[in-house]
Design a protein with these regions (language model features):
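Active-site lining segments that contact anionic ligands and/or coordinate catalytic metals
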Residues: 72-73, 92-93, 120-122, 151, ...
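Residues at helix-coil transition
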Residues: 147, 269-270, 287, 306, ...
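Glycine-rich phosphate/pyrophosphate-binding loop
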Residues: 79-141, 292, 298-317
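Conserved catalytic-core segment of nucleotide-activated headgroup transferases in glycan assembly
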Residues: 100-192, 199-201
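Conserved nucleotide-cofactor-binding alpha/beta core module
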Residues: 1-72, 81-86, 154-274, 279-294
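Surface-exposed alpha-helical segments enriched in charged/polar residues
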Residues: 25-28, 143, 147, 266, ...
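Short, flexible coil/linker elements and helix-boundary hinge sites characteristic
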Residues: 178, 317-318
Length: 318
């Protein structure tokens, strides 16, 4: 991927080897007009390098599901579902809404064909999200689904779940919610993308965590023909699933409350005919939706950058 990105750029600078002061100088020396940072407050971020405002316009996008709180970042790219009108006061940045969705999904070229679990397989809910998202709110949301379908199982796939302490913690938390450890399958880590995606063949319906929804995991599940049920939350991180599903034309999988979440998820595995019909068309539905329309997304992103720059120019002339 690095090679592909480098080939598509007019210039490429390895900023990992630069300290914050050197990165500040590198941005200024190249006359960058609009700078987009993609990390926010995540590991390895370079927010301190922005402290002296090295570019006239600075935006944050995609990588962090909240305001950065950074005084030198002007704009934050979101959409009208993740950050509806009226939520502006939650952010230090001004919001740019890239409707219908703030991101675009590029399906992997080597993804296997979608496959349904066998007819004799028990109803299996699943999540391939990071284990740190499986906190109390998520377990409180998912446990009633498993109770509503007593013969069902839950498949969890997360890199850290292979660690004994993490695995034990997950099982203990579900146990406290009345879910026996024998109903939970911890799937093995896959060495490559194809192997990772192939494991969706073990899952009937995916469950979205809350309040920190899946993003790539949701898109991957849909691409592999697995419907994802999400709870519409009250902040960006808890509304990403809603944005993705509505953009894909799958608003029926968005639950307004916990009771509806249980009803939707349990209803899908109980109605095999409906589930088979839905799964058979999911990849095509996603492929035809704005969520995978890269050229259209590119135009929206371009137009947003241009609008931010023009706004700065107008203010500078005033």
């Amino acid at each position: 991927m690095t090679a592909d990105l480098r080939a598509a750029c007019d210039g490429w600078v390895d900023v990992a080897v630069l300290d914050d002061a050197a990165l500040d100088r590198a941005i200024r020396d190249r006359g960058i007009d609009v700078l987009v940072e993609l990390n926010g407050h995540t590991g390895g971020n370079r927010l301190p390098a922005l402290d002296r405002k090295p570019a006239p316009v600075i935006a944050t996008a995609i990588g962090y599901p909240n305001t950065t709180g950074h005084p030198c970042i002007d704009w934050r790219f979101v959409d009208a579902v993740t950050d509806p009108p009226g939520t502006e006061a939650r952010c230090t940045e001004r919001l740019v809404r890239l409707d219908p969705c703030f991101l675009c999904y590029a399906p992997p070229a080597d993804a296997p064909e979608p496959a349904m679990p066998g007819e004799d397989a028990p109803p299996t809910f699943g999540s391939f999200n990071e284990a740190k998202k499986l906190q109390s709110e998520t377990i409180a949301l998912w446990a009633p689904v498993l109770h509503a379908v007593p013969e069902s199982r839950l498949a969890i796939k997360a890199r850290s779940a292979a660690e004994p302490a993490v695995r034990a913690s997950i099982l203990a938390r579900f146990g406290a919610a009345g879910i026996d450890a024998g109903r939970i399958d911890i799937l093995p880590f896959a060495a490559d993308t194809r192997g990772h995606l192939a494991q969706y063949a073990r899952v009937h319906v995916a469950l979205d965590p809350t309040p920190y929804n899946g993003t790539t995991t949701t898109c991957e599940a849909l691409w592999m023909g697995v419907p994802v049920v999400t709870l519409e939350g009250d902040r960006h991180a808890a509304r990403v699933g809603t944005s993705l599903l509505r953009t894909a034309g799958l608003g029926e999988l968005v639950a307004p409350d916990a009771a509806a979440f249980t009803r939707i998820a349990a209803g899908l595995v109980r109605d095999r005919e409906r589930l088979v019909r839905m799964r058979s068309g999911l990849r095509g539905t996603l492929a035809a939706s704005p969520l995978t329309d890269a050229p259209a997304y590119g135009r929206r992103f371009h137009d947003a950058l241009r609008a931010c720059w023009r706004e700065w120019c107008a203010r500078s002339r005033a």
